[in-house]
Amino acid sequence: LHLCDRRQRQMCIRDRPVIEAHPEYEKQAILERLVEPERTLMFKVPWMDDNGQVQVNRGYRVQFSSAIGPYKGGLRLHPSVNLGIIKFLGFEQIFKNSLTGLPIGGGKGGSDFDPKGKSDREVMAFCQSFMTELCKYIGADTDVPAGDIGTGAREIGYMFGQYKRIRGVYEGVLTGKGLSYGGSLARTEATGYGLLYLTEEMLKLNGIELAGKTVAVSGSGNVAIYATQKAQELGAKVVTVSDSTGWVYDPEGIDVAALKEIKEVKRARLTEYKNYRPNSEYHEGRGVWNVKVDIALPCATQNELHLEDAKQLVANGCYAVAEGANMPTTLEATEYLQKNGILFAPGKASNAGGVATSALEMSQNSERLSWTFEEVDGKLQNIMVNIFHNLDDAAKRYGMEGNYVAGANIAGFEKVVDAMTAQGIV
């Protein structure tokens, strides 16, 4: 299948019971059709920097699958971006979007442009040039990109403005927009809140209450902050957060207001946290997974939780891990946690709250409505609870009860394949 990435091979292996149970899939070449994008776009992005020099970056949009709805997936702006990374992320996005139960297909895009160190004018120049080409291939009912690494509210705003200027229409062609021009309430909180809604449901099904439990969270960005906030609202105690230089241990529970001020207002390092909570400890480097906790929520970055970390969590009596970041747990660590009976919620399910709320933003845009925070949050909670029950049911149907990684892959896969089968060979 020409899938060089180990995670894609793992997914195909986990879906083998489904394929064996449906010989018609092989006859229709479902896998061969699924792993090839419907469309791959690659284009130059010329723009002028503040010194009057013309710069050229490369832009990408991989429109992977529209079997269940318009292509949906973020735009990543980072020097590491290449076609291989975008294709892999787009492939994963198909199944994450499918799990939400909402009518959204899978796609991904981006550029090797680095917004760090660039002026606002340079970022605007790049975004306008990028959208000048991309606008030919996207639309509210065709392909709806969103933010990702390097693409925040500023970049989305510049891209939306250029799309509107060229196409002459005001439509929900991007999500993650500002509230003043079609964005959704609760979008900022969605991934972190959704993580806790799914984690709570996973624990509940296994006879465990979230309230009263001790939680380790890694990261201190958007997902980590709102995961911490929601965990403490639900009665748990979060005792750690981290950033790229070190981590904080607060035995009394992380002060979310202090964390927000440090990270969202001051944009400072966690070394300042001790100024707010004198009884807390700051440690340089890694080590957040060495703390004895009941639940671990990796919310920082890809491949942050290694095999040795998994061994430490098991030794310390941790009994649940749910991924808040995209693929933060290595394959070896995931397998070790599962073999040792740890409840493990994979990111394609547990951090799907962000894309789910993006789809809710699309719904509001199409209806020309703006829902209240409580309305969006209530819909998000229902979506996350349903995601968990769908993956749990899928795992049970194929004799893999408790294997939520396999359950998530199967549940996402089945919906897409059913749609592909119904629509014929297209």
Q: What is the predicted function of each stretch?
A:
Residues L1-I13:
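Single conserved hydrophobic/aromatic residue that forms the stacking wall/gate
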Residues R6, M202, V314-V426:
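Adenosine-phosphate binding glycine-rich loop
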Residues Q10, R14-M42:
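Short, Gly/Pro- and small/polar-rich lid/capping loops
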Residues E32-P115:
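Glycine-rich, N-terminal phosphate-binding loop and its surrounding beta-alpha-beta segment
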Residues H78, N97-A211:
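Glycine/serine-rich phosphate-binding loop and adjoining beta1-alpha1 elements at the start
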Residues T175-G178, G183-K292:
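Glycine-rich phosphate/diphosphate-binding loop of Rossmann-like nucleotide-binding domains
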Residues G246-F344, A349:
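Rossmann-like adenosine-cofactor binding region
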